[in-house]
Amino acid sequence: MAEKPKKSQKLRARLPRGLADRGPAELAATRAMVETIRAVYERYGFEPVETPAFEFTDALGKFLPDQDRPNEGVFSFQDDDEQWISLRYDLTAPLARYVAENFDSLPKPYRSYRNGYVYRNEKPGPGRFRQFMQFDADTVGSASPAADAEMCMMAADAMEALGIPRGSYVVKVNNRKVLDGVMESIGLGGEENAGRRLTVLRAIDKLDRLGIEGVKLLLGEGRWDGGEQGKGDFTIGAQLSPETSTPILNYLDLGIRVARDRVESPNRELGIVGYLEQIVSGSETGAQGTTELAQIVRLVEAAGYDDGRIRIDPSVVRGLEYYTGPVYEVELLLDTKDEKGRPVRFGSVGGGGRYDGLVSRFRGEPVPATGFSIGVSRLQAALTLLGKLDTRPQAGPVVVTVFDRDRVADYQKMVARLRAENIRAELYLGNPKNMGNQLKYADKRNSPCVIIQGSDEKNDPDGAQIIVKDLVLGAELASLEKDREEYLQKQAEAQRKVPEADLVDEVRRILAKHSVRWS
């Protein structure tokens, strides 16, 4: 007996972990955020540039989020000429390549901004995605501390433009040279210790999340993600002895206390700088760092930014090794609860710093640079939970229904009239047999109104008429069951017959009545 043919199995529709689909309301909120940030950046004189999502892996260089293998930490593949190509993991390394490639034609200093998605080949988790959006601004070709101070001021202005009031955010500033001075003192200076130094920096970068004890484990043998032996994944530490790690832990612990408590000084920020000078005394690199911090403090204060907006915080290090001087982070100070009622502290939503060696790799000459990046995806999640973003579904288009199959051309003409007046409109393209289904479709599209014209309206003795149904008002009728008089009045308003010639005016009246604006 012949075997029965096997049924073809349906392909399961699913997404890889760490990725998410996004609908119209979320995309509209992203667009509004991006335009707000763009306006701030352009007010500071920055101009747009766009680089591709892919770069040669060697252009990203040794500064990949993870080390050793080209596809560790980033998504990579080999091209047909066997060269490794990677998806960008940030927007800074591609900018460095772009500037180096177009160096002679660009004005210096070169001030640019760009936004787009970046990609991380990392273990996904709550709030950790493999694709997310960033919005960067960078100044290439200036070694002046004024360029760093400007990044901090622009970050503060961007937060306030997005509706985050003063006191609800802070721009925290430090200098990697200060920490480099500490690491020099424990024998971790020089190129030969670059790998261990990067591990130390990544450990310190987790201070907000893991606390001093968690960082202590990562400076030593390592840490189990579950918090106990054998629980979760194991992260290998920097393998520092307790004696070697003590100066770093003291720096962090004392630095946090100084940053938290009011310093006995007329100027709190310069008081912290003075404290850091004592920690790195004897280190030329550390002394350079404290001098640059003092210059930034004076510049931002002169521009009117007090320590409630921009302040020194010795715990800020940033995780990537390409930073060479001042580093900064924007932290939200607001607490809220997630959809399950659990407390949420958002922490850092942006950061950056000076990276004087990144462009120089391509040029063989010093090219100073500094930049700042806003994590748009992370910040949007925070603003949504805080109720700072309008996440309601956007108004859909006006829907022109099809009452008579043989008059589709007439209905298309109505759609064209509306579009010519800059009104979003569409012709119903499904099966026109059931008018009820057409109205349900318009409801699902969140349409403000629908247009109906049957043969009776078309051949009206007083001239061609149309029926305009106000769907917003119609939805309100359900709550008016007890007030019959108001119900009947609104019912009459929700469906009006008007001359076809008044199509545009009637639709505009309804849009204005319900404050419908398409962004």
From Swiss-Prot:
Signal peptide span: none
Any one GO MF annotation of this record: ATP binding
Keywords: Aminoacyl-tRNA synthetase, ATP-binding, Cytoplasm, Ligase, Nucleotide-binding, Protein biosynthesis
Record-annotated disulphide pairs: none
SUPFAM superfamilies: Class II aaRS ABD-related, Class II aaRS and biotin synthetases
Protein name in UniProt: Histidine--tRNA ligase
One GO term of the biological process aspect: histidyl-tRNA aminoacylation
Subunit note: Homodimer.
Family: Belongs to the class-II aminoacyl-tRNA synthetase family.
Organism whose genome encodes this protein: Rhodopseudomonas palustris (strain BisB18)
